[in-house]
Structures are given as C-alpha cells and as structure tokens.
C-alpha cells in the first residue's frame, strides 16, 4: 500500500518477496515479472498439465485453464499485462494445443517473483541480531514453502535442525553473496 511504519518484535522474519530489498537494502533480490492468463475450454478439454519450452497449461477444478508464464527480468516493478507478454502466452498455447487459441480468454494477471543472482532463495539468519530472512524463491515459492517454514520455525525457536535442513540452510545462506 506504500504505507511506512515501524514494526517491532523480538524476532523478525523478512519474507517480503520481490519487495524484500526495499526493507533490507543489501539483499541481492530483484523482481522478475510473470504474466499469465486463463482460457475457457470445452468441458474436460485437458485433464493434465501440459508443459512446453516456455509455456504450461494447467486445468483448474473450475473449468478454466491457466496459461503461464512469462519471465521478464528487466521489467522491474512495471505493473500490468503487456501486448508482448500476452502474445508470448498465445504463442505458447499455439505450440502446445493450437485449437485452444480459439477458446475465450477469461482473465489476465501478472506478478513479481523474488529472484537472486543465482536463482536460489536466501534463507536463515542475517548479520542483524534476531532478523531472519526467507525470500528469493523465484519460481519455486510454493514448492519450497513447507521446508522453508519448518526451518524458519526451528531457527526462531532455537530447535535442532536435521541434516537435510542444515544442508538446505548452508546452500541458501545469506552469506553466499
């Protein structure tokens, strides 16, 4: 919302996605814009996810098919769908399922993925006492959400990490930059 205010806590996790750098300036996080759209196909037109080189089609329970997604690393925080982005998605539809180009487009949207120079998240403690970070998951935020939240909980509660969690933290440490 653009609101600026002070927030206090004993321990704080910075998990602001693509906007994380606005809170902690030395984080090497930058936004990568992704545009998507949905189409309405005939009933049961596709029953599984279709993957192509630059596009995927995902059937949803409500009958819509999600078409994703562009990867625009120079877009910064420029909002809105663009003709170029929509065209790229349509080309992807054409390559995967040409007849779907005739199906009505229902929704268009965009978002900003938090990315790091090595495309890996930053997870764990920072140099600031009691400040933790969990950001930069790029296109894998949903995939890494469970293990990230488990690790962050254990760190904050000062619980013992297992070998996988310890390896995960080392690999994605803030200190690698």
Listing of model-derived features with the role each one plays in the protein:
Residues 43-129:
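Active-site lid/adjacent beta-loop-alpha segment flanking the redox-cofactor pocket in flavoenzymes
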Residues 17, 70, 136:
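Short, well-ordered beta-to-alpha junction loops that form the rim of enzyme active sites
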Residues 20-21, 44, 74-75, 140-141:
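Short, acidic Gly/Pro/Ser/Thr-rich loop/turn segments
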Residues 5-51, 80-83, 99:
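Central helical "cap/lid" subdomain
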Residues 1-2:
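A conserved short coil-to-beta-strand element within the FAD-binding core of flavoproteins
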């Amino acid at each position: 919302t653009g609101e600026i205010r002070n927030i206090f806590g004993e321990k704080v996790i910075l998990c602001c996605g693509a906007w994380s750098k606005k809170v902690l300036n030395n984080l090497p996080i930058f936004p990568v814009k992704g545009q998507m759209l949905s189409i309405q196909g005939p009933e049961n037109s596709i029953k599984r996810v279709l993957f192509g080189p630059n596009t995927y089609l995902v059937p949803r329970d409500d009958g819509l098919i999600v078409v994703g997604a562009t990867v625009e690393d120079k877009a910064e925080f420029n909002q809105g769908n663009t003709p170029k982005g929509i065209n790229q998605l349509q080309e992807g539809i054409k390559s995967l399922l040409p007849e779907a180009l005739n199906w009505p487009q229902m929704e268009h949207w965009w978002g900003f993925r938090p990315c790091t120079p090595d495309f890996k998240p930053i997870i764990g403690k920072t140099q600031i006492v009691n400040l933790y970070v969990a950001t930069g998951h790029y296109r894998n935020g949903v995939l890494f959400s469970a293990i990230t939240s488990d690790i962050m909980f254990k760190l904050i509660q000062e619980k013992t990490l297992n070998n996988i969690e310890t390896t995960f933290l080392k690999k994605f440490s803030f200190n690698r930059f």
